[in-house]
Amino acid sequence: MAGMKTASGDYIDSSWELRVFVGEEDPEAESVTLRVTGESHIGGVLLKIVEQINRKQDWSDHAIWWEQKRQWLLQTHWTLDKYGILADARLFFGPQHRPVILRLPNRRALRLRASFSQPLFQAVAAICRLLSIRHPEELSLLRAPEKKEKKKKEKEPEEELYDLSKVVLAGGVAPALFRGMPAHFSDSAQTEACYHMLSRPQPPPDPLLLQRLPRPSSLSDKTQLHSRWLDSSRCLMQQGIKAGDALWLRFKYYSFFDLDPKTDPVRLTQLYEQARWDLLLEEIDCTEEEMMVFAALQYHINKLSQSGEVGEPAGTDPGLDDLDVALSNLEVKLEGSAPTDVLDSLTTIPELKDHLRIFRIPRRPRKLTLKGYRQHWVVFKETTLSYYKSQDEAPGDPIQQLNLKGCEVVPDVNVSGQKFCIKLLVPSPEGMSEIYLRCQDEQQYARWMAGCRLASKGRTMADSSYTSEVQAILAFLSLQRTGSGGPGNHPHGPDASAEGLNPYGLVAPRFQRKFKAKQLTPRILEAHQNVAQLSLAEAQLRFIQAWQSLPDFGISYVMVRFKGSRKDEILGIANNRLIRIDLAVGDVVKTWRFSNMRQWNVNWDIRQVAIEFDEHINVAFSCVSASCRIVHEYIGGYIFLSTRERARGEELDEDLFLQLTGGHEAF
């Protein structure tokens, strides 16, 4: 037994004194001194600490933090010897959950208690459960950017700080609903206001404030954001986060699973807000026409949110809508089950044949050319695109045959100018071949664009998603078409008028510099006619879908240096591929699909990522702007997200995620 003494007062056993500070990491905190042995288990040490403090309170959330090893002692049955703790260990007895300031995707600030002892993946899952956000695996936390000291100190406007630090949820139990919201939000007027902030879109920002916010001016600037992601396999305490620190909550992985407006009001709204701010802060590029569509959708969403019309548009019966949807689904199933249709789909391979105008840019042009598009007869079958001089020559050898698997497909569209082009960056031994296809109209463009997108993923037009892809492209084009509403088309929602419309709060600053407000307002109102009948949830979904249609959507940028190269380049990470980008001009140099990846490894000693693809293709690079852990986690995270199944619901294989994203980096 620890602490046995002789008559003279000397200790005759192997016990020794262990000092433990009470509270968070503060050298001046009160401390207790315990008499322990190497065989003392952590649970017994915790009990002795509480007995010596002799203060009645709930200690259930407290645990011991070992400062030198940056480790929580959570295995209460382990002994001090098993942990390797000696008398010189600096130990702190403090709470595992501590307050942090969370900056949400909608830019609002929220105080809550987060776990400082669990891996970040679990801590984010608990935060999302508190905020009523499904599929927490899509989100993560970033460090807040360091504030630059200004020569002239400006008085920052006071912002409202919502507080959920006193809300505690029972573990493992899904929050019950009360009055249309999770029950823990209905406890007080403050928590109810917090839920409304989470689930309802925020008004447009002040245009002057928007112009002052930092924006990326180059690809290298865009890499800075992704250097701040926290490690999902380590706890907040291990990563130097302290109580009261500010963190950002963002959607990290651009692979959104089972997005349902009925069950996901908070998730849908926060995703819309992240997309909106991506556009306003120019973190993703879009054309002038596309910006007008996004501005019109924001204007419509803001009007509906302010008027309280959050449900279906007036004049509709939800019951009838549900019945119509059910009948429509039944009709589709009955039509799709016809034996002749099934037979045709099995015996015929879908293909596209049409006249298209083609312009091919050589990899290294010897001289400048003024030659433009030339009309060809183009045949698109499976994942192969072939073009001929004329239709009569089609049975023979083509001028060129391209396998689009693994290529980059970029839209180049101007609806008002009737320009419908598809830019293809096709991998070749010399690099990426650049080819443009020019279509005659929207219908032709939608069919060929959908086929190219599927082929780039290794799928054919026989895939069940081809028709929905065509429809999604046509829907996005229809939003950009002006004047389609007509004078007699009166929206069911709030009246569309210039009253209360400040266009500078709806468009990115580069468009503010290019156009005057009186030029933007009629264009936004004209685009609004195409979306005026959408409900709030439909408008948010349409905004997100349009955001997903942009060429640069879902690409996270990291500055790297490839093995054997003397210059820095950009590595783009998307949900299905890696993209090598020239830092100087922004051109895509090479693309590698995750589906062709055999394995990847990280050498933590030399900070290098090595990836092996099919056909004995090996790629290695070191990271410049961020830790190689971030690239490793992105790759593993996207592979994990691709394993999700609808049948499993929200059940997560946490061990698999940590296996795919965790590293063996020495802390």
Curated annotation (Swiss-Prot):
**Residue ranges constituting the PH domain according to the UniProt record:** 354-457
Keywords linked to the UniProt accession = Cell adhesion, Cell junction, Cell projection, Disease variant, Phosphoprotein
The record's annotation in SMART domains points to: B41, PH
Q: Which InterPro entries match?
A: Band_41_domain (IPR019749), FERM_2 (IPR035963), FERM_central (IPR019748), Kindlin/fermitin (IPR037843), Kindlin_2_N (IPR040790), PH-like_dom_sf (IPR011993), PH_domain (IPR001849), PH_Kindlin/fermitin (IPR037837)
Q: Does Phosphoprotein count among this protein's keywords?
A: yes
Source organism: Homo sapiens (Human)
Q: What does this protein do?
A: Plays a central role in cell adhesion in hematopoietic cells. Acts by activating the integrin beta-1-3 (ITGB1, ITGB2 and ITGB3). Required for integrin-mediated platelet adhesion and leukocyte adhesion to endothelial cells. Required for activation of integrin beta-2 (ITGB2) in polymorphonuclear granulocytes (PMNs). Isoform 2 may act as a repressor of NF-kappa-B and apoptosis.
Note the Pfam families from the entry: FERM_M (PF00373), Kindlin_2_N (PF18124), PH (PF00169)
* Disease affiliated with this protein: Leukocyte adhesion deficiency 3: A disorder characterized by recurrent bacterial infections without pus formation, leukocytosis and major bleeding disorders.
Gene encoding this polypeptide? Answer: FERMT3
Protein name, please?
Answer: Fermitin family homolog 3
